[in-house]
């Protein structure tokens, strides 16, 4: 922006002072001095005005930004994403007091259903949306848009007292289908395997089924279905015969991570794709987000949001 000012200058003309003995033309003495004073005044005025204008513009921009970030956002879905989604919302609201964000879990399927029913703005999901869900949304005139927000590895966990430290993907599938029922068949002690699984509304349940159990096959009827990653971690920590699966962000020293095909689930192996049960985590919206929703999603995908992904034990986007 050009901050130069047009200053109106009024020329006083030539003024003279007469005496009896001589006449002094003051124009040649006074004019240069007046010009110098005028220049200094102009520069000072211009500088002051420019500073005031910049300050005014900054204040206006801040006010506009605040106005843009006023509103409410509702989010529901994946239990795997719940901790990081809560951290995102709290941090964003701290930075933007005019924004209110409500976050609920309940499972990926529950979140996607809520989005399709029009009761939430974003659905968190630890699995990709299903064809039938897209069809239902389209029948209501919706245009579901997928946003990758993080990467996860589904860790297979057992009790720290369990001597088994590595299972093949094939063995793991047989265990969760109920075809292998005793730990001695995979190098452990003679004890019946206690299967712990997420419930069917969970995206983790769906992804593990597709990747490990078999898309067209079923979990063993003996599998105990639990409502959250934390519930599985707690059960495994309390039962020496238990085996379950949880998101990376829920792994603690109270459980032992079993390698799958020789690769242990970690931030590094999920990031490079070497761990066989790695996946993206998603947020879904009806159409491209606008206004405060767009600002929130951009923030999640930016440096601050992705740092929180790492802080919560998951893998930032590349």
Question: Where is each model-derived feature located?
Answer:
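Short, Lys/Arg-enriched N-terminal segments with co-localized hydrophobic residues
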Residues: 2-25
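Residues at the start of alpha-helices and the adjacent loop-to-helix junctions
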Residues: 6, 27-28, 77, 103
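Enrichment for repetitive, rod-forming helical segments
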Residues: 17, 34-35
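Bacterial N-terminal signal peptides that target proteins for export
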Residues: 25-34
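Bacterial N-terminal signal peptides
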Residues: 35-42
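C-terminal motif of bacterial Sec signal peptides marking the signal peptidase cleavage site
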Residues: 44-47
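Exported/periplasmic ABC-transporter solute-binding proteins
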Residues: 49-318
């Amino acid at each position: 922006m050009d901050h130069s000012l047009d200053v109106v200058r009024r020329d006083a003309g030539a003024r003279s002072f007469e005496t009896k003995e001589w006449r002094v033309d003051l124009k040649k003495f006074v004019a240069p001095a007046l010009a110098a004073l005028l220049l200094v005044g102009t520069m000072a005025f211009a500088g002051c005005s420019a500073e005031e204008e910049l300050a005014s513009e900054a204040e206006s921009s801040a006010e506009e930004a605040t106005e843009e970030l006023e509103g409410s956002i509702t989010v529901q879905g994946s239990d795997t994403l719940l901790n990081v989604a809560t951290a995102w919302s709290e941090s964003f609201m701290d930075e933007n007091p005019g924004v209110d964000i409500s976050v609920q879990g309940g499972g990926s399927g529950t979140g996607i259903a809520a989005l399709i029913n029009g009761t939430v703005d974003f659905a968190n999901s630890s699995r990709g949306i299903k064809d039938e869900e897209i069809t239902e949304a389209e029948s209501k005139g919706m245009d579901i848009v997928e946003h990758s927000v993080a990467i996860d590895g589904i860790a297979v966990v057992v009790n720290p007292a369990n001597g088994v430290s590595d299972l093949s993907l094939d063995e793991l599938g047989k265990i969760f289908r109920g075809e292998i029922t005793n730990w001695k068949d995979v190098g452990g002690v003679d004890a019946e395997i206690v299967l712990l699984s997420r419930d069917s509304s969970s995206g983790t349940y769906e992804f593990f089924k597709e990747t490990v159990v078999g898309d067209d096959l079923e979990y063993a009827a003996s599998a105990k279905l639990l409502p959250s990653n934390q519930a599985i971690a707690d059960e495994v920590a309390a039962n020496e015969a238990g085996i379950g699966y949880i998101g990376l962000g829920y792994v603690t020293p109270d459980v032992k991570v079993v390698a799958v095909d020789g690769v242990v689930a970690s931030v590094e192996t999920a990031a490079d794709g070497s761990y066989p049960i790695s996946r993206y985590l998603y947020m879904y919206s009806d159409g491209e987000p606008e206004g405060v929703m767009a600002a929130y999603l951009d923030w999640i995908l930016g440096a601050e949001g992705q740092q929180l992904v790492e802080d919560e034990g998951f893998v930032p986007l590349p």
